[in-house]
């Protein structure tokens, strides 16, 4: 009788986990439906202000990391749906221009842009309290260079570079009104050939106060002789997307 009881207990202990596993449904979000289709969001996580570039058949993405470390996490994809973490561009420390006395949630690394030029990857971002920074690497997995302060200034945010056919390098950016006392404008400055330093003042190329307030987050492209600036406006909850175009880098757009 004792042996029978032990056998029954053993059977119950081995059966219940199997039943539990057979009834378990994973709650992990999977955007790839497996049939050539997908559902949004493709990343069910906090990847604010994402930006991506394509190199051959590969896509690389980064996003705002604010005061968190490792910062500027790099994701890789072949199809823009399935993403894999491959590294971080700011793994150990934030740009050491000013060290706050206490953690500053929501500050530091805002709205980066990742680009590939002449065999190197570049990431530009704005620190709303310090200015525009840049890091670069030959391999997106790293190692990445130390952050370089490209343009100092309060309120400089949402930076994006453009390498023109004539060798000139430009940087488009917006302003955080909370720091600069100025917002709803898009500006452009020229950088040196190494893209490490601004060599001209920023010029306003678009003023959104009349019809496109809170214009920010500009992305800079050139195609078929036209310069394009894509940017959101109207604020996060009720905003819209604006596309600007000009034959001249400084406008009119």
Segments the model singles out, each with a brief description of its role:
Residues 7-17:
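Bacterial N-terminal signal peptides
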Residues 21-253:
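Carbohydrate-active catalytic/glycan-binding domains of CAZyme proteins
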Residues 1-4:
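Positively charged n-region of N-terminal signal peptides that target proteins for export
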